[in-house]
């Protein structure tokens, strides 16, 4: 079984995905990390190369290659604007695609930053000084990606849960222990 977690940045795909994989005994993959390994460049460099369509196609190719193997896995999917290359995959019997959602305010609380070397750091002073901007951008992302992810069969509202609570709720809601 391949569990694909979709959602906006900072919604909790990676942390929840790692826990979900651990609880189920699955392998965890992060599409951002897979892109870095595939191309040998940082994400900062990657997002500065070529048009978004080409970058999303590469991400979709990586998703295809990961789901091709029969091993059970959880895959945290980078926000994708162009998902047409994986639409047939989403209806595959060995794929469960789930959009993780939460409010802009809850996502803002989890907001972290990364430097040019992809080192993640937290800067709450900066974050809160620019709260209006970030909340607005998060809301725009929720609306944009929400419109794209309407084709996904499964949607899950995190509702401010912790990653542990979210992983357990996903297992219960989607009967993942039985899959």
Region spans (language model):
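Hydrophobic anchor at the beta1->P-loop junction of P-loop NTPases
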Residues: 5
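P-loop (Walker A) phosphate-binding loop of NTP-binding proteins
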Residues: 8
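ATP-binding Walker
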Residues: 11
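Walker A/P-loop
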Residues: 14
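Conserved substrate/cofactor phosphate-moiety recognition/catalytic segment
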Residues: 22-64
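Glycine-rich phosphate-binding loop used to anchor ATP phosphates in small-molecule kinases
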Residues: 56-96, 100-101
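A glycine- and Lys/Arg-enriched "phosphate-lid" helix/loop adjacent to the NTP-binding pocket
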Residues: 94-144
């Amino acid at each position: 079984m391949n569990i694909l977690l979709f959602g906006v940045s900072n919604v909790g795909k990676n942390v929840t995905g790692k826990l979900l994989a651990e609880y189920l005994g699955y392998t965890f993959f992060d599409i951002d990390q897979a892109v870095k390994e595939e191309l040998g460049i940082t994400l900062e460099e990657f997002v500065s190369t070529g048009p978004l369509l080409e970058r999303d196609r590469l991400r979709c190719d990586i998703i295809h290659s990961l789901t091709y193997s029969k091993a059970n896995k959880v895959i945290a999917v980078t926000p994708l604007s162009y998902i047409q290359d994986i639409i047939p995959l989403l209806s595959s019997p060995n794929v469960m695609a789930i959009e993780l959602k939460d409010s802009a305010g809850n996502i803002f609380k989890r907001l972290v930053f990364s430097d040019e070397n992809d080192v993640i750091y937290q800067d709450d002073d900066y974050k809160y000084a620019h709260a209006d901007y970030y909340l607005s951008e998060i809301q725009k992302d929720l609306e944009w990606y929400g419109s794209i992810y309407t084709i996904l069969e499964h949607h899950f509202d995190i509702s401010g849960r912790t990653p542990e609570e979210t992983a357990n709720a996903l297992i219960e809601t989607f009967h993942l222990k039985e899959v």
